[in-house]
């Protein structure tokens, strides 16, 4: 996002288009992302989002990397242990995106901007044989060793994305554009993506800008609540509409509602807070 000066000399925020590049390991996705950034003069970011999340919320960058890339524990699928990382990662992504147009080729980009029409979501794929050649070139592995290495990377990433977002990251339905890098060269892929993101369908509109602002405020409030010692274990629904924040959920301790409102009101971009908090069912409190 950038600041422009309107005719009445007041600053106005202008949202620019965003491209997310999800890619199979060793499919050339990083090179394509960097080429697009060069063509469009966009920022190209990856771990910068993890650094921003770590700086804002005091969570080590290495922990985010572990959550996104390493083999998960069996209990994470049923417990809410990943909620902290999912929420703070999205909040950090929104903060990075507000600084201007960007290409994001890190993990989970396709899931971090739900409902934003000026985000072009791209998936880069390639056949196993092509990726095996890349592994041989970069790591010296070949044959079954290369294939096992890639299958393990794919398995771990798929498991992590299911645990974090309950989604299959390789499902093409979740993307606007799918490119086979074994058939389309880096320069051609970058040209195709660059042309697509400049089309009418992906240009920011007043509606998409508002949707982004609402997402950013929602993410900020969610992150503030989940990083506060008093409210971190409470699951709440948060929604922002033009700065008016609506918070709903079930709360066993009614005194915490004031704390929830206080935390939300302290968030930048929040103009008002409305709550719809209910007590737990009687059978829950007295089994």
Name the predicted role of every residue range.
Residues 50-104, 141:
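ATP-dependent small-molecule kinase phosphotransfer cores
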Residues 115, 126, 133-137, 153-154, ...:
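N-terminal targeting leaders
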Residues 21-34:
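Glycine-rich phosphate-binding P-loop
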Residues 102-138:
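ATP-dependent NMP and nucleoside kinases share a basic, alpha-helical "lid"
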Residues 39-45:
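Post-Walker A helix-loop "phosphate-sensing" segment adjacent to the P-loop in P-loop NTPases
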Residues 1-15:
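Short, Lys/Arg-enriched N-terminal segments with co-localized hydrophobic residues
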Residues 50-66, 127-128, 132-156:
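Long, charge-dense
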């Amino acid at each position: 996002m950038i600041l422009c000066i309107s005719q009445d000399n007041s600053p106005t925020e202008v949202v620019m288009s965003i491209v997310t590049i999800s890619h199979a390991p060793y499919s050339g996705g990083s090179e394509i992302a960097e080429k697009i950034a060069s063509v469009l003069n966009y920022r190209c970011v990856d771990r910068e989002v993890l650094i921003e999340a770590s700086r804002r919320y005091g969570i080590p960058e290495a922990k985010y990397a572990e959550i996104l890339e390493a083999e998960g524990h069996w209990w994470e699928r049923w417990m809410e242990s990943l909620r902290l990382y999912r929420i703070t990662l999205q909040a950090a992504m929104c903060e990075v995106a507000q600084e201007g147009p960007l290409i994001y080729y890190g993990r989970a980009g396709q899931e971090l901007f739900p409902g934003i029409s000026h985000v072009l979501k791209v998936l880069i794929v390639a056949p196993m044989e092509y990726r095996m050649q890349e592994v041989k070139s970069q790591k010296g592995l070949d044959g079954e060793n290369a294939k096992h290495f890639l299958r393990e990377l794919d398995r771990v990433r798929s498991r992590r994305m299911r645990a974090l977002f309950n989604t299959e990251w390789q499902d093409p339905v979740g993307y606007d554009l799918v490119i086979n890098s074994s058939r389309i060269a880096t320069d051609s892929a970058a040209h195709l993506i660059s042309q697509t993101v400049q089309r009418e369908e992906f240009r920011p509109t007043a509606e998409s800008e508002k949707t982004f602002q609402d997402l950013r405020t929602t993410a900020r409030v969610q992150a503030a609540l989940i990083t506060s010692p008093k409210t971190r274990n409470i699951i709440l629904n948060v929604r922002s509409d033009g700065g008016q924040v609506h918070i709903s959920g079930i709360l066993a301790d009614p005194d915490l509602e004031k704390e929830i409102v206080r935390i939300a009101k302290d968030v930048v971009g929040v103009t008002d807070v409305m709550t719809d908090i209910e007590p737990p069912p009687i059978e829950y409190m007295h089994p």
